[in-house]
């Protein structure tokens, strides 16, 4: 029997942004559990125009790749700020602090992370990019 899971990221996965005080400027749908991922994490995220995630974060074990689906913005990686746009893929190694910001039209992106890590892998720093 084939082993697979199909979920719609917009309708089948809850927006967790309100739980973390990020709404209404941020939409964040973490699909790892809904997809029954064994070795990776996946999220769908949307930033309103000129909105920034309210914290920076880094992981002790997990590497992440962000893919911009639409819009544009900027990403801060430690002390380096880069402009990013549609179809850009950004790999961020563990131990690199990161934060994203939507451009004038906002930004929608998917984030992939591996390996799948237990709670506590991320260090969250509120207001890191201010």
Can you describe what each PLM-predicted range is?
Residues 32-34, 54-59, 101-102, 127:
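Short histidine-centered beta-strand/loop micro-motifs
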Residues 4, 99-130:
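Double-stranded beta-helix
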Residues 52-53, 74, 90, 94-99:
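Histidine-centered metal-chelating micro-motifs
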Residues 61, 80, 96, 105-106:
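A generic "binding-loop/recognition-motif" signal
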Residues 37-40, 48-53, 72, 81, ...:
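Short, charged/polar surface micro-motifs in flexible loops or helix N-caps
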Residues 1-39, 49, 121-130:
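A short, N-terminal "cap"/entry segment at the start of jelly-roll beta-barrel domains
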Residues 79-95:
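Short acidic-glycine-tyrosine-enriched beta hairpin
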Residues 44-48, 58-76:
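Short, conserved beta-strand element in jelly-roll/cupin
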């Amino acid at each position: 029997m084939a082993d697979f899971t199909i979920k719609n990221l917009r309708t089948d996965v809850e927006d967790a942004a309100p739980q973390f005080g990020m709404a209404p400027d941020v939409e964040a749908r973490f699909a790892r559990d809904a997809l029954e991922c064994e070795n990776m994490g996946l999220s769908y995220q949307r930033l309103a125009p000129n909105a920034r995630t309210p914290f920076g974060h880094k992981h002790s074990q997990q590497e992440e790749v962000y893919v911009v689906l639409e819009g544009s913005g900027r990403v801060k990686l430690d002390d380096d700020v880069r402009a990013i746009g549609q179809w850009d893929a950004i790999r961020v190694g563990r131990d690199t602090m990161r934060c994203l910001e939507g451009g004038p039209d906002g930004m929608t992106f998917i984030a992939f992370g591996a390996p799948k890590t237990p709670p506590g892998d991320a260090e969250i720093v509120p207001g890191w990019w201010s």
